[in-house]
Amino acid sequence: MSRMRMGKVMAGVLAAALGAGAAVVEPKNTDEILTNPGMGICHFYYSSRIWAYGAASEPGDTLDWMPGTSVIYMRLPWCYLEPEEGVFRWDILDSKARPWIAAGKKIAFRISCMDPTLCSIPDWAIRAGIRGSESHYRDNPKNALIFEPVWDDPVLIEKVTNFYRAFAARYDGNPDVAFVDLGSFGLYGEGHAPKLRRIREEDPAEYDRLCHLHLDLLRKALPRTYLVVSEDIAGGGWIETDASAIGTTPNPFTPGGKPRLYDHPILAYARSIGYGLRDDSIMCNAQRPWASDHFGRLFARETPVVIESGHLSKRLQTKSWRPELLRKCIEEYHASYISTHGFPEIYWKTNKDVWSDFANRLGYRFELRRVEYPDTVKVSEKVSVKSTWVNVGVAPQYANASLTWNLLNEKGVVCWSVTDPKFGFRSLPPKLEDGEKPVEVVSPCTFGYTAPVPNNGNDAILNWCIQNNQDDPGKTVALLKPGVYTLAVSVGRNDGKPEIALPLEGGVGRVYPVGRISVVE
């Protein structure tokens, strides 16, 4: 990094002496919409349809023009991916995922066994003996016939398990996968269907057993993957109960009405085996735009929450879409992801005026408010860098990223890197109703390393260097040369690799300059 560029970066920074050899910097945070792991806006490329909502997109378009879009989400019926038993069309997924992965973004999936527009279970699997029945969607003879299986049919469980095994061989523990939804149970994977509704009403214990069966199937198949389940599997957040019941919460859209269940046994079980929550979907009802925010807050204590908007075209048609509510919904769910359920151009056009308003509250967002450090240090001297951080997002950073302080030379090359051995960003509380919670971090740092060169005559390489007067290290070796460096901050892995974008100016490769520091012998 050139001196001129560094000067421009530091122009908006307050720096003052704090006694001899100490400096304080108060960086100016920007309002840039960031793209970060473990959070962000999800593009609905396949929405239970092979053609919507991404088929019209240009190849390679990763929607950088929709800032904060970090995930391509693909929800497809099983029949597309296994048209013959044991013959898989992974190329339908991988061809669309490749550009996103190359751009440093993530992928997410839901593979369903029941959808309203076609038979989602492959024909060969039904011929193998899966029991079930056909009915017209929503009992309308004009709608397509759809097949609802017997949800614990042994052949269904066998074939789904085999598919999961093949799917897991490619995607379980894959670092490019953000999450996988449960899709094998109910219409869309949401736990409801004509016969399932009757079972839930007439025999709740049997319905719970079926839920557990399918939750366990996916969990067993993908033990190293973040799994997500729709809140509809528990009936959604609309369930009301008596005010005297234990464990209730108010209903914000029906003041004075019955309160909602605070938790649900099925969701509690899902949490116990590591599932996160997804709301399918918000703003489908003009009077009650959402109902499961209380479930979202429960899950958000430990896992990222996903909210999904209703199909935008339908919401615009019914006049239930209210862009100004996106931020409020994110705040009430403590959401980390939001899925844009519609054609991206229409979604952007409809919501661009509120985009930064909601995107900069989604998930986590780390602001560096203050840095105090010695402006001159000796090589190998133990010093401290004191920094103050605020998470102005609505959710924690669940992966617990690490804090690293770097020294850059005039070319912007990292010459030294020290990662705080204790502090993790999971401990940084999000900004909720009770306001910001700044956290001061004192990072122990040692810049450089000097050591004597052992010379007992047995080192043939050292002897050659001395005899040929070439690359002779002398009596000591210093791994960091004295000089003036740029102190820079980064957030990421505990080995120092930067991964998290910060709202700071002048960053290159997610390493951000803070100030100048001199290293002396």
Which stretches of residues belong to each language-model region?
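Active-site groove signature of glycoside hydrolases
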Residues: 135-156, 161-201
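Bacterial N-terminal signal peptides that target proteins for export
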Residues: 1-10
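N-terminal substrate-binding region of glycoside hydrolase catalytic domains
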Residues: 24-156, 295-331, 335-349
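Extracellular/luminal regions of secreted and cell-surface proteins that mediate adhesion/ECM remodeling
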Residues: 359-521
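Hydrophobic core
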Residues: 14, 18-19
